[in-house]
Regions:
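Cysteine endopeptidase catalytic domains of the caspase/legumain-like
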Residues: 1-185
């Protein structure tokens, strides 16, 4: 929604929501950001499979650095508030009957369940790594009609992490330390 004095206001509208009554049937993105900030959760990752979702991605993103044990420890120690949306602010979500859902959900499943988003095969999938994977694969599957957006909602330095395999650098560090304590994830 365009604001009278410039800028935009975004809403998450459920499939049964009423676009004429946004205040009662949707979630204001500013409120979602406020909830994220006051939440006691250490890591939050929003995955938004919705048309025009790009307005939600407000932070910056970077290239995926090499994931050493120290790097994994740092990004899991710090808080994170991240978001990956199915497309840009002016894009519809592409669905095909043979997929059974959207290009975003198809590739989210492939990326996490099959480990395809684990670009360096270390058994750890970061939200940034997942965002890079989804951006590439959804753009291809949607014939360039939809490009996922990803980034941080706040300036916090942490990262949401999926442990895909038991044979990860995190678990290797624990074994090398000969310590029964796991890293503080």
């Amino acid at each position: 929604m365009d604001l009278p004095e410039g800028g935009e206001m975004g809403y998450l509208l459920p499939v049964d929501g009423d676009s004429e009554n946004l205040y009662l049937s949707s979630i204001d993105m500013d409120e979602l950001e406020k909830i994220s900030l006051i939440s006691k959760a250490k890591h939050i990752l929003y995955l938004v499979d919705a048309c025009y979702g790009g307005i939600a991605a407000v932070g910056s993103r970077g290239l995926e650095p090499e994931k050493t044990p120290n790097y994994i420890h740092k990004i899991t120690r710090d808080k994170s508030r991240q978001i990956i949306t199915a497309g840009g602010r002016d894009e519809l979500v592409i669905e095909k009957p043979e997929w059974g859902h959207s290009a975003f959900t198809l590739n989210l499943n492939r990326g996490l369940k099959e480990g395809r988003a684990d670009s360096n095969s270390d058994g750890v999938i970061t939200a940034n790594e997942l965002g890079i994977f989804l951006e590439e694969k959804v753009t291809i599957d949607s014939d360039n009609q939809q490009t996922p957006q990803y980034g941080r909602m706040t300036s916090q330095e942490g990262e949401f992490v999926f442990i895909y395999s038991e044979n990860t650098i995190v678990n290797q560090q624990v074994a090398n330390n000969n310590d029964s304590k796991k890293m503080d994830l």
